[in-house]
Amino acid sequence: MQAAPVSEALVDLADEVLVHTGQHYDEAMSGAHIHATRLPHPRHNLGVGSRPRDEQVALGQERIAEVLEIEQPDVVVVRGDTNATLSGARAAVAARIPLVHVEAGLRSYRDDMPEEHNRIETDRLADLLLAPTPGARTNLINEGVSGRVEVVGDPLCDTLERWRPEIVPAEGEYLLATVHRNYNTDAPERLHAVLECLARSPWRVTFPVHPRTRAALKSWKLAVPGNVDLVDPVPYTRMLELERGAQMIATDSGGVQREAYLWGVPCITLREETEWVDTVAAGWNVLVGVDPDAFAKALEHPRPQERPNIFGDGRAAHRIAQLVVELASSELEAAA
């Protein structure tokens, strides 16, 4: 959804070809989100679907390579840390097309996270690395990446500023929960501990269930606490309403951690680490893993008095668009 402001910023500067890999195979996770956020309709939908990571990355690379052969772009832009990100990065490098990585330099230092491997390899391949925060830039400099590094801010900040006037907080007192990381859903004892955490909430828990999580709950036959309301995945704008209206948010999602911070809603992260360390340093995000006692303690964590501006001024998309066009222009001049 963070592609929307960047696409808007590029409208008058370049011809953008938006590619949707189909990594999120559930309609509520993809098509409905694209519709809700008014993203331009993707010119190519690759239908990669759900499959083991290595297969997903390889198939995504193969199909993106076919798109690159058809479209012949001057620059390839990838964002974030998904398998699709890595597929696009590898395809661009193989085709000798300059690569831009948006959201570069983030590190959780957790080796068993596929997202961490995706980030690191993409950063090593990129020609232009666009870091959302100064800390992310520092990570890249310390790693000695070969590409050019620029701090641009977080496009997610642009997205929320765009939607803020239209997002009415959901009613009622509730804790909002999201869980989808493989290490939280693929081990029954860990997913059970997540449910034990949610059972400690003094409010009812609204839990939009990711397809991976729903399948795991069913597979492991885990009992859902009585205070937890499982609901189907919701469109992005509805998710923002739920976030804005929540008393607190419990999540293992990097995006939701940032959205919680930008809404000013305290967050409990169901991980032992986070790539968004600034939210923890500011006191708005508490890391508890899946320890129910730590979760209960975090529920009592005092709301900070201040919320520093750590994600930029809402103009990240403008900076990204300008830098992408500059890179494309320089490549064309060099080839002339």
What feature does the model see in each segment?
Residues 210:
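Conserved C-terminal portion of the radical SAM core fold
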